Amino acid sequence: MRQHDFRRFLNALGDLNPAQIEQAQTKIMDLRRKTEVISEIEARTNQENSCPSCGIDRRQKWGRTRTGIQRYRCQSCGKTYSGRTGSVISRIHRPDLFLVALRDMLGTSTPRSVRALARQLGLNKYTVWRWRMLALSIIQHREATAFSGIIEADETYQRESRKGSREWVRHFADPQNVPQPPRPRWEDFTTKGLKMMRGLSKWQLPILTVADRGGARLLQRLPNRQSATLERAMEPLMPKDAVLCSDGANGYATVAATGGIEHVVVGTKPGTRVTAGCYHIQNVNSLHARYDKFIKPFCGPATKNLNLYIRWLEARLAGIGPTDVIRAS
């Protein structure tokens, strides 16, 4: 827009009625979202300015895409590309709304349900679900966490879930040919009065939680509760000069003995939870509470997606922002 046209536009704002002001504000917010996501995508191109087809870094500007992103033409092979070419988000038609979905996922407030977010964005719930899974696939790749000093370790548990498997539907439709699934649905224990399994069972999935006093944290789903599995998961995390604090589980004692690491066992009853004034596992207990609060609104995510949800929580705790996800895509 030319400068004199822009001044006329600003002068005309004083003639708007309240309804028109609301419409103008909504339009400006939409434009601001689009501008922000375009800036992040183009920043990604400036960091990696080589052609995704031939790898040559000689290019020239070649117009803009339908979504307003700068397009380039390779001066070597003649192919055109933009900041989204070859990225995970290359086929998203509304990158501005995708940025809103990322802010909902990684903001300070509790993430909204897929249905609530879809209503806000005016999209189908399955579109929002696919976007969420796409974002989780981007942030699931993490760097190795380095621990030092006093290291706390414990486990928390998550119910096994087959959400979306349709196995009970197929069984009810053809009970003669489709066998009954190995576990009743969790709702059947309440609605049909089935007796709940006491204590820990094979349907309780262990999640290893590790934290040190420097702020390093790790949540990792384990395939089972065997001591050997715990040892394999803990061994690469423990430096030689660390002090391991845990409960009395056998796996931790073996890890400490194998690595020659000092091991302090703390109790679970009042008066035994802190040893020598500084040895405790309150940091991982706090991590368990954060995990429970985070996972509760999802009503038990499918086990096949549990690792993605764990990484989602780690990303929120680490302060990863929406723009970091777009640049990493």
Segments predicted by a language model, with ranges:
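Residue-level recognition of single "structural anchor" positions
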Residues: 1-329
